[in-house]
């Protein structure tokens, strides 16, 4: 609950930044990086490095090992699984930040950002087929800005590799049998819900929501 100069401002959502400050804080003060948001917005560094990566994955036929030399494949896999589980339809064409160290051997990595579009927002069913949505930009005309072909191409190219697709499916099964399921989600969510449940209507009234 947030007050500014004694004036009630409702509930303040504090979250970690998703820009170069995140890297500086979590990577021992690293500053020399390339960073691109939403596939084409240069935030830090050299766009040529990013364009070289895009040119690489636009082509078919690269192996898991080739990809893993220039990007953190398993981290990307985890980020995709996370957003598919959330049914986040404001990703991957939006709310995605790529970065890499400029030092030799630096690989592209992903920062998770803004997943509030998921977990049934706007009444989407738990049976919504996020995989089909990811592969077909015409699957849902009301949610068709973040699944355009240019935004899903990297994932689709990686899924053409047998090793990647097998590991992706295995990880989905393991995660959903362990922590990506209703019971574990509710175990984390319920205390947070109970903490703000009485305050939230007051917050919404303040902002006429």
Predicted regions and their residues:
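Middle-to-C-terminal accessory/interaction subdomains
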Residues: 1-3, 8, 12, 39-209
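Conserved structural core of kinase catalytic domains
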Residues: 9-42
């Amino acid at each position: 609950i947030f007050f500014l100069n004694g004036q009630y401002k409702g509930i303040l959502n504090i979250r970690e930044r998703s820009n170069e400050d995140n890297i500086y804080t979590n990577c021992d003060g690293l500053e020399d990086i390339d960073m691109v948001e939403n596939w084409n917005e240069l935030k830090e560094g050299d766009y040529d490095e990013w364009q070289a990566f895009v040119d690489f994955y636009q082509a078919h036929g690269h192996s898991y090992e080739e990809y893993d030399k220039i990007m953190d494949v398993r981290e990307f896999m985890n980020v995709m699984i996370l957003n598919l589980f959330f049914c986040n339809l404001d990703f991957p064409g939006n709310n995605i930040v790529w970065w890499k160290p400029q030092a030799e051997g630096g690989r592209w990595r992903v920062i998770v950002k803004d997943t509030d579009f998921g977990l049934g927002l706007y009444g989407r069913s738990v049976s919504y087929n996020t995989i089909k949505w990811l592969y077909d930009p015409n699957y849902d005309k009301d949610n068709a800005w973040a699944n355009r072909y240019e935004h899903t191409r990297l994932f689709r190219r990686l899924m053409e590799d047998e090793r990647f697709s097998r590991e992706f499916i295995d990880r989905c099964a393991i995660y959903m049998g362990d922590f990506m399921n209703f019971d574990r989600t509710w175990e984390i969510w319920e205390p947070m819900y109970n903490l703000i449940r009485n305050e939230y209507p007051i917050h919404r009234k303040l902002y006429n929501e």
